[in-house]
Swiss-Prot record:
Disulfide bonds: none annotated. Homotetramer. This is Glucose-1-phosphate adenylyltransferase. HAMAP family: GlgC. Alpha-D-glucose 1-phosphate binds at residues 107, 172, 187-188, 205. Keywords: ATP-binding, Carbohydrate metabolism, Glycogen biosynthesis, Glycogen metabolism, Nucleotide-binding, Nucleotidyltransferase, Transferase. One of its GO terms (molecular function) is ATP binding. The keyword ATP-binding applies. Pfam families: Hexapep_GlmU, NTP_transferase. The keyword Secreted does not apply. Involved in the biosynthesis of ADP-glucose, a building block required for the elongation reactions to produce glycogen. Catalyzes the reaction between ATP and alpha-D-glucose 1-phosphate (G1P) to produce pyrophosphate and ADP-Glc. Belongs to the bacterial/plant glucose-1-phosphate adenylyltransferase family.
C-alpha cells in the first residue's frame, strides 16, 4: 500500500495504453488499421480520448502498446503526440510487440502486453500504473481514481459503470459491497449477474485499472509463470486479486467530465458499426453529451494543416448548406445539402447531392446528384454520380455492408464492384 505520497498522484503515475486490438466487429473499417486508430469526431482518432484524459489528468509519462496493423496508429502517434519533453520529466513511448522476453511475435494477452515491457516501465520508476484501453470514447479525470485507490488502500482499483444486463456479456462484470470493494469478478459472462438493487443492470468494468507499480510487477511475474493462465487482466489478474487481495470499484460517475452540470456521464465502446455511427452522430446534437469544445478538457490530436472549409453556390436547388453538422478543414461543399453529418478532413461534395446522418472519413469525394442516408464512408472512397444509399434496404445489402440497424458501411472495393 502507498504511504508518504501527497496528491496530485497523477504526477507519480504512468499511463499504459493497450492499443493492439483489431476491433473485428467494425468490419472493413479495421481492415487497414487497428481499432484505436479509427477516425472519430471529425478530426480525431479513437485513441486520442484515452491519451487526452491522461494528459488532462496531469499524467506526463505515457506508453502505448501496439500490435494489429499498427502502421496507421504509430504514424498518428508520432505526428500528433510528439510534444513530450524528457527535460521536463515527460515521456511518450510506442511499444510494438517485438519478442522482448520470448520468441512469441505477438503479445499473448493484455497482461503479457505489459509484462513484456516491464524493463521499460521500470526505467521510469513510476509509483502508479494507470492501465487503459485505447478504444473507448469518454472523458475522465484519472486523478480522482488515483485518489480513491490510495484512500482505500487497494491493490487494484477498477473503473466501472452501470450497463443494461442484456449488453453486459461483452464486459467484465463485478459484484461489490457497500464500500465498493469487489467481491466477485467474471470476465464476459454468458449470463451477467444483476446489481442487487437494479435487476436490469450490471456493474461492468471499463477496462481501466490502477495499480501500485511494485504490486503490479509481482502479479505479472506470478501470472507469467502460470502455464494455465491466458495472461489477460480481465480473465486472470483481476479475479486473482479479488480472491487474494483487495480490489475496489471506481464508479465512472465520480470522475467523468460532463458537457454541463445536468448531463449524463458519457462512455461509448464504439465496437460495432452501429455504435460507431451513433456515437459520431451524437456529436451533431445542439448540446451533445460529449463536449469537444471544452477548453478545460481538450481532446488532443494531430493537427493536419489544411485550408478552411468552403461552401459554394447559392441558387435554388444548388445551395452549399450544412445543418446540425460538423465540417472539418479542407472540405468543399459545392451546391449540396448536409443534415446531421460529420465530414472529416478534405472531403469534397459535388453539386445537387443530399446527405443525411452520414459519417464521412477523410478525403472522400461524393459525386453529383447522390442521395446518401445513414452511411459510414471509409477514407478515400470515390462515390460515383447519382448513387442512392439508404432508400432500398435489399439493394443496399447486396452492394454494401448493411447492419441490423440499417447503417451502410461503404468502402472503395465495394464501389469498384458496382455495376453502374
Amino acid at each position: 500500500m502507498t504511504t508518504g505520497i501527497e496528491p496530485p498522484f497523477a504526477r507519480h503515475a504512468m499511463a499504459y495504453v493497450l492499443a493492439g486490438g483489431r476491433g473485428s466487429r467494425l468490419m472493413e473499417l479495421t481492415d487497414r488499421r487497428a481499432k484505436p486508430a479509427v477516425y472519430f469526431g471529425g478530426k480525431s482518432r479513437i485513441i486520442d480520448f484515452a491519451l487526452s484524459n491522461a494528459l488532462n489528468s496531469g499524467i506526463r509519462r505515457i506508453a502505448v502498446a501496439t500490435q494489429y496493423k499498427a502502421h496507421s496508429l504509430i504514424r498518428h502517434l508520432q505526428h500528433g503526440w510528439n510534444f513530450f519533453r524528457p527535460e521536463r520529466n515527460e515521456s511518450f513511448d510506442i511499444l510494438p510487440a517485438s519478442q522482448r522476453v520470448s520468441e512469441e511475435l505477438w503479445y499473448l494477452g493484455t497482461a503479457d502486453a505489459v509484462y513484456q515491457n516491464l524493463d521499460i516501465i521500470e526505467s521510469y520508476d513510476p509509483q502508479f500504473i494507470v492501465l487503459l484501453a485505447g478504444d473507448h470514447i469518454y472523458k475522465m479525470d484519472y486523478e480522482k481514481m488515483l485518489q480513491q485507490h490510495v484512500q482505500q488502500g487497494a491493490h487494484v482499483t477498477v473503473g466501472c459503470l452501470e450497463v443494461p444486463r442484456k449488453e453486459a456479456s461483452g464486459f467484465g462484470v463485478m459484484h461489490v459491497d457497500a464500500n465498493d470493494q469487489i467481491l466477485s469478478f467474471i470476465e464476459k459472462p454468458a449470463h451477467p449477474p444483476a446489481m442487487p438493487d437494479k435487476p436490469d443492470m450490471a456493474l461492468a468494468s471499463m477496462g481501466i485499472y490502477v495499480f501500485e507499480t511494485k504490486f503490479l510487477f509481482e502479479e505479472l511475474r506470478r501470472d507469467a509463470a502460470d502455464k494455465n493462465s491466458s495472461h489477460d487482466f480481465g480473465k486472470d489478474i483481476i479475479p486473482h486479486i479479488v480472491k487474494h487481495g483487495k480490489a475496489v470499484a471506481h464508479r465512472f460517475d465520480r470522475s467523468c467530465i460532463r458537457s454541463h452540470a445536468e448531463s449524463a456521464s458519457y462512455w461509448r465502446d464504439v465496437g460495432t458499426v452501429d455504435a460507431y455511427w451513433a456515437a459520431n452522430i451524437d456529436l451533431t446534437d445542439i448540446v451533445p453529451q460529449l463536449d469537444l469544445y471544452d477548453h478545460n478538457w481538450p481532446i488532443w490530436t494531430y493537427g493536419e494543416i489544411t485550408p478552411p472549409a468552403k461552401f459554394v453556390h447559392d441558387k435554388v436547388g444548388r445551395r452549399g448548406l450544412a445543418t446540425s453538422s460538423l465540417v472539418s478543414g479542407g472540405c468543399i461543399i459545392s451546391g449540396s445539402t448536409l443534415t446531421q453529418t460529420l465530414l472529416f478532413t478534405g472531403v469534397r461534395i459535388h453539386s445537387f447531392s443530399t446527405i443525411e446522418q452520414a459519417v464521412i472519413l477523410p478525403y472522400v469525394e461524393v459525386g453529383r446528384a447522390c442521395e446518401l442516408k445513414n452511411v459510414v464512408i471509409d477514407r478515400g472512397v470515390r462515390i460515383p454520380d447519382g448513387l442512392v444509399v439508404g432508400e432500398d434496404p435489399e439493394l443496399d445489402e447486396q452492394r454494401f455492408r448493411r447492419t441490423e440497424n440499417g447503417i451502410c458501411l461503404i468502402t472503395q472495393p465495394m464501389i469498384d464492384r458496382l455495376d453502374l
